[in-house]
Amino acid sequence: MNRPCNIAARLPELARERPDQIAIRCPGRRGAGNGMAAYDVTLDYRQLDARSDAMAAGLAGYGIGRGVRTVVMVRPSPEFFLLMFALFKLGAVPVLVDPGIDRRALKQCLDEAQPEAFIGIPLAHVARLVLRWAPSAARLVTVGRRLGWGGTTLAALERAGAKGGPMLAATDGEDMAAILFTSGSTGVPKGVVYRHRHFVGQIQLLGSAFGMEAGGVDLPTFPPFALFDPALGLTSVIPDMDPTRPAQADPVRLHDAIQRFGVTQLFGSPALMRVLAKHGRPLPTVTRVTSAGAPVPPDVVATIRSLLPADAQFWTPYGATECLPVAVVEGRELERTRAATEAGAGTCVGSVVAPNEVRIIAIDDAPLADWSQARVLAVGEVGEITVAGPTATDSYFNRPQATAAAKIRETLADGSTRVVHRMGDVGYFDAQGRLWFCGRKTQRVETARGPLYTEQVEPVFNTVAGVARTALVGVGAAGAQVPVLCVELLRGQSDSPALQEALRAHAAARTPEAGLQHFLVHPAFPVDIRHNAKIGREKLAVWASAELEKRA
């Protein structure tokens, strides 16, 4: 019998092969004395498989089965991982939304998803009632103590399904597996439709791209990524931190977990990498670091590499919720390309992960229904990055206009068709076949002299003394926009005539073609809620416009 196409299909096999290996280790209670987490809550592979089977049976008996769209609002905990694997085993469709997004946007996301079930902690159910989230959800499950809102509890369902036996739906690769909402860093979040083949493809590509092998110990600081660990046979140590605020993580607590459990690999956003870099403590057990969500600043790459063993690897995969991974680059290559990045070449995101096919097309803000409408650009030409491959998703849920704007239908030579995803990013290929990222398409600045791309301007100015980071925005109508550089300073620094002169001199020497004349110091850039690393340039553009009016 063929194994179903399902991310949970590997779990029963791992439960037989390595039943006593810890699959999930959670912080649990605070340890006595030093205030560190005890990490006394664990699940081994045998327990993860058996308990998720019981939950799946209980959920099925309650009416949450194959194809049922189910909102999941549960903090990183054993219950979160058990629940997610139970839903995958059932062939139900978990709906995941970042809890930190704007409340109105969150309500819109849940309304669009039209969920039939809602599973959450008590606080999530209170918010559901007060803010009228997901009124379509008829089946309610509480993770924890249920109060007066009806439904049942996850614990009760697990008890009810205790004798249900193995549970694994015969899911097909084309079946919907989940709806994962984007972070909404450049607009209202969109629900990305994941099919089972997309998750299975991600597992295969992540394993091959990074050489992940069963038995390793991972510290995933972005909870959804922890779901990949059990499918790869890894032990997942859930860090003692708020996953929605990686920039505020306590490096002492992270190091405590890394040292105590011999963590061999960790995943974190660039904001979390900066936390570890500033802390400056070596990471002797870590052989693989992966950072994604936004380009990692060159100084952070260099510092993290200096804290790792000499043979360790620091990977920065390029991709998006809609398609991941697309390309990967290792820290050594990033250090070699640092000078080019700081000279305005963009950020190297490395080699395309096979079997993805990445092509650069001419920038066009209009939808492209068919690939014949796209014009593929030559090596060195900046255009929109597109990708076709096993993890390229094909639609957004209940967002036909967004789907039309981001997806292109392509007919292949054998008559078959596939969907090409438009990344919404601009970039180019160099002569060595490496992909370079130049910024978001919607964040390009269209001046009278021509377009400017954020990642070809900002790194040039991030090297100026006293500057923490910069953000290029445009003020005015497209085609005649005035470029403005917003500047965030290092702690203890302040705006001054000397700083303004240094920025102007840098612009004249390094980017004369950009025509930059306005440098506005901003107290703290707005960033995305998922990785705390993507700069909210749309908000900064509004602020910059108002500032220029004041100074006119």
From Swiss-Prot:
Gene3D superfamilies: 3.30.300.30, N-terminal domain of ligase-like. It catalyses: a (2R,3S)-2-alkyl-3-hydroxyalkanoate + ATP = a cis-3-alkyl-4-alkyloxetan-2-one + AMP + diphosphate. It is an enzyme of class 6 (ligase). ATP binds at residues 182-190, 316-321, 425, 440. Pfam families: AMP-binding. Its EC number is 6.1.3.1. Keywords: ATP-binding, Ligase, Nucleotide-binding. CDD domains: FACL_like_1. One of its GO terms (molecular function) is acid-thiol ligase activity. It comes from the Bacteria. The keyword Cell division does not apply. The keyword Magnesium does not apply. Belongs to the ATP-dependent AMP-binding enzyme family. Monomer. Involved in olefin biosynthesis. Catalyzes the conversion of beta-hydroxy acid substrates to beta-lactones in the presence of ATP. Can use all four stereoisomers of 2-hexyl-3-hydroxydecanoic acid. This is Olefin beta-lactone synthetase. It comes from Stenotrophomonas maltophilia (strain K279a).
